[in-house]
Amino acid sequence: MAWSTLVDPSPSVLTNPIPFPSGRGIVYVITDRRAAGERSLIDIVHAALRGGANAIQLRDKDVPARAMIALGEALLPLTRAAGVPLIVNDRVDVALALDADGVHVGQDDIPADMVRRIIGPARILGVSVATVEQAQQAARDGATYVSVGDLFGTPSKPDAGPPIGLTPLTEIARAVDLPVLGIGGITVANAASVVRAGAVGVAVISAVIGAPDPEAATRALCDVAAQR
């Protein structure tokens, strides 16, 4: 069955979405219940925002829409107060229900061009890519940014496949006129190499969500990501 038969392609307009951060030094934090353990994801995200995170992605592949919406409703006041966009992974329905600032999709999710038609021109659209061809297609589909990985191997996505390393990131950053983030196994120790390879910043899960002090961990990543 074609994707076009499953969704209404008419756009949804958000009056004042928070834009994707401009410039370099972006630290984009992705939520993960498993990495949080018994700690509150809301508290962790709040700490990350205090530490300087300038984009938050709500990601949870394993919970019903209602639970994801409930978490999003708790996070939105924090991100709005910080002037930071809240981007929903995969779930366009959840993003629209929340009036979130954007959606992020992978290569096996709803096609990016269809997501763009649904969410309208103002919201953020992120796409996961691993090759120049995928990044160029994302640009044609209306992506706001792309994330490139898995760079180093990550415990957060055991099905991500073998790490691709930094060379594809450099090639993608040269090939598309979009902000490029590195993702996959990024830590304070290797974040500088990601930025030197051409990324405008880093997307992280465990490095912040699983850190004993998420605020300090985010601040350290921000310091490294801002360096050239």
From Swiss-Prot:
4-amino-2-methyl-5-(diphosphooxymethyl)pyrimidine binds at residues 57-61, 89, 128, 157. InterPro entries: Aldolase_TIM, ThiamineP_synth_sf, ThiamineP_synth_TenI, TMP_synthase. Its EC number is 2.5.1.3. One of its GO terms (molecular function) is magnesium ion binding. 2-[(2R,5Z)-2-carboxy-4-methylthiazol-5(2H)-ylidene]ethyl phosphate binds at residues 154-156, 185, 205-206. GO terms for biological process: thiamine biosynthetic process; thiamine diphosphate biosynthetic process. Binds 1 Mg(2+) ion per subunit. Keywords: Magnesium, Metal-binding, Thiamine biosynthesis, Transferase. It is an enzyme of class 2 (transferase). The keyword Magnesium applies. Its cofactor is Mg(2+). Pathway: Cofactor biosynthesis; thiamine diphosphate biosynthesis; thiamine phosphate from 4-amino-2-methyl-5-diphosphomethylpyrimidine and 4-methyl-5-(2-phosphoethyl)-thiazole: step 1/1. One of its GO terms (cellular component) is cytoplasm. Signal peptide: none annotated. It catalyses: 2-[(2R,5Z)-2-carboxy-4-methylthiazol-5(2H)-ylidene]ethyl phosphate + 4-amino-2-methyl-5-(diphosphooxymethyl)pyrimidine + 2 H(+) = thiamine phosphate + CO2 + diphosphate; 2-(2-carboxy-4-methylthiazol-5-yl)ethyl phosphate + 4-amino-2-methyl-5-(diphosphooxymethyl)pyrimidine + 2 H(+) = thiamine phosphate + CO2 + diphosphate; 4-methyl-5-(2-phosphooxyethyl)-thiazole + 4-amino-2-methyl-5-(diphosphooxymethyl)pyrimidine + H(+) = thiamine phosphate + diphosphate. The keyword Magnesium applies. Mg(2+) binds at residues 90, 109. Condenses 4-methyl-5-(beta-hydroxyethyl)thiazole monophosphate (THZ-P) and 2-methyl-4-amino-5-hydroxymethyl pyrimidine pyrophosphate (HMP-PP) to form thiamine monophosphate (TMP). Belongs to the thiamine-phosphate synthase family. This is Thiamine-phosphate synthase. It comes from Roseiflexus castenholzii (strain DSM 13941 / HLO8). The gene is thiE.
